[in-house]
Amino acid sequence: MDQEESHVISIFETFGAYFINIFYNFLYKNALYKKHSIVMEYQYQVKGYILGVKQNKKLYEKMLDSFYKYFCNITQINSKTLSFSNFVSTIVDSFLPKEYSQSISLEKKDSILELLLCDYISNLGTFITTEKMLPFIVKNRKENYHRITKEMQDYSLTFLLKKRMELYNKFLRKQAYVEPKTELEETYTRLSSYNRSLLYQIEELTSEKKSLLAELSTLRKKYEKRQSEYRRLVQLLYQQIQRSSSSKNSYPLTKFIETLPSEHFSNEDYQKEAPRDQKQVETELLKQQEELLASQELTSKSPSNYPVPQSRTIVSKPSDNYPVPQSRSSKIDFDNSLQNQELNVKNGFSGKTILELNQDNPEIEEDILEFNQDNPEIEEDILEFNQDNPEIEEDILKFNQDNPEIEEDILKLNQDNPEIEEEVILEKENHKEDEPIVQNPFLENFWKPEQKTFNQSGLFEESSDFSNDWSGGDVTLNFS
């Protein structure tokens, strides 16, 4: 045992000797003056002393002053040398580590000493009043004096050493041990760290958003530029289609589509009425040309009743002399009307005169149609006669070549009578004004030729070089 430990034990033994004397001698003497049972009276005196020290401040100060004087006498230290404050520091320092005792104030040491004394007195009084100790203190005191006092001193020293160890550990824990945080503090710390992580994520997302917005702005500018280029190309393509369609005299499909409502393309009626493919239309057009050639072969021979003069070429367009059918399906009517018109020209009747005659006398046309339907063999006989007698047409041509004076007489008659020629010119101008309006662009292409060859009697001549791939230009039709 070192010197420091022996000094502490000597202080603790002096500490215990003072209070054991009070409990064993002083309180026992006070119990003898009472008339009640000495055991019960002694217990009462012990409890009263403990409560007085804890609750009565004056009694505590009186007890402490008495203990101070006792300490000075036992240790043989002069009271002038050991002041009361030094006494308090000496007692308290024996319970605390040196590194902490110097930093604690005197007021703090007074409170520590008060707690130590109150706790010590309470535990010592409880130990003395137990059934094990009380009979030996009250009865047979002289016989049991040494044994009882020795047990009381051992208990006092053991308690003070234990108390010293508790205070040592308490101060050491304050130095090395961090007190655990409360649940609220832990929650605050956890949420603070989570909040910092969220703020970091927000900063990253904000920067990413800025970069994405910049990319979006760039893409939007590119899209607007491409869209403007696309619109310009579509407009140029549309203009090119319009120019090509106008140059080829094809259907104005683009304008037609523009005028249609948005729901028109989904209509079943429109799908039924929609124009057929260009290839199908061209195929039908070729068939029409072949049928026209076949019909012209049947009527290529001129009647024997009319002389055929030398042919002359004139520039003309479709007029009243050539009726235009209104649909592709009326091919037979078109051929019949063309043959009827040729016969009318042979007989010296203009198309305008025939139209006026038909309008004024509709029953005549009905009678003619009914007669043709009832007697189809007459027209077949005429065609068969023309085919069987080609020499009649040759005789007419030969007659015109052998008698040129007839044509000279006609020219002289025109010179002597200019009013007749003026009437002929006016009649031609009227024919030009009455030209039909071609509504079907495919038929317009069909009537495209700028020149046709007619003879002086009004009959057009058929050429043997007529081909199905004709796409416009001069057409010469010669009757042989």
UniProtKB/Swiss-Prot annotation:
Residues 195-235 form a coiled coil. One of its GO terms (cellular component) is membrane. It comes from the Viruses. Induction: Expressed in the late phase of the viral replicative cycle. Disulfide bonds: none annotated. It is found in: Host membrane. Gene3D superfamilies: arf6 gtpase in complex with a specific effector, jip4. Residues 301-329 have a biased composition (Polar residues). Glycans are attached at N73, N195, N455. Keywords: Coiled coil, Glycoprotein, Host membrane, Late protein, Membrane, Transmembrane, Transmembrane helix. The chain crosses the membrane at residues 7-28. Belongs to the asfivirus B475L family. This is Uncharacterized protein B475L. It comes from African swine fever virus (isolate Pig/Kenya/KEN-50/1950).
